[in-house]
UniProtKB/Swiss-Prot annotation:
This is Large ribosomal subunit protein uL18. It comes from Mycobacterium avium (strain 104). One of its GO terms (cellular component) is cytosolic large ribosomal subunit. One of its GO terms (biological process) is translation. NCBIfam families: L18_bact (TIGR00060). This is one of the proteins that bind and probably mediate the attachment of the 5S RNA into the large ribosomal subunit, where it forms part of the central protuberance. Keywords: Ribonucleoprotein, Ribosomal protein, RNA-binding, rRNA-binding. The lineage of its organism: Bacteria, Bacillati, Actinomycetota, Actinomycetes, Mycobacteriales. Part of the 50S ribosomal subunit; part of the 5S rRNA/L5/L18/L25 subcomplex. Contacts the 5S and 23S rRNAs.
Length: 122
């Protein structure tokens, strides 16, 4: 018997992410923008891989995002704006985008575009 469709999709996503992680790493000057998506929420972190620390983070679980009216895509846009603001406050203008193996579309693209519009360089 084969795997379920959801298990196959998850394994494929993890393989894509592993391939991507071989090629990119975050530095103090240019941290990695990591996106994690669930069915309900989206989380994003700026990670310095040299010392394994999180520089800044934003999530749709936060109160000001959670209270937003609209769909999950609108919340992703707000999370992208928040991470760009927090990156600027930490003195970061450029990042390496790690989409976590997710396809670039929908909520992932909305978050990335909002971060770019608010001054974050990819």
């Amino acid at each position: 018997m084969g795997q379920s469709v959801s298990a196959t999709r998850r394994v494929s996503r993890l393989r894509r992410h592993a391939r991507l992680r071989k090629k990119i790493a975050g530095t103090p000057e240019r941290p990695r923008l990591v996106v994690n998506r669930s069915a309900r929420h989206i989380h994003v972190q700026l990670v310095n891989d040299e010392n394994g620390t999180t520089v800044a983070a934003a999530s749709s679980i936060e109160d000001d995002v959670r209270s937003l009216q609209g769909d999950k895509k609108a919340r992703s846009v707000r999370v992208g704006q928040l991470i760009a603001e927090r990156a600027k406050a930490a003195g970061i203008d450029s990042v390496v985008f790690d989409r976590g193996g997710y396809t670039y579309g929908g909520r992932i693209a909305a978050l990335a575009d909002a971060a770019r519009e608010n001054g974050l360089q990819f």
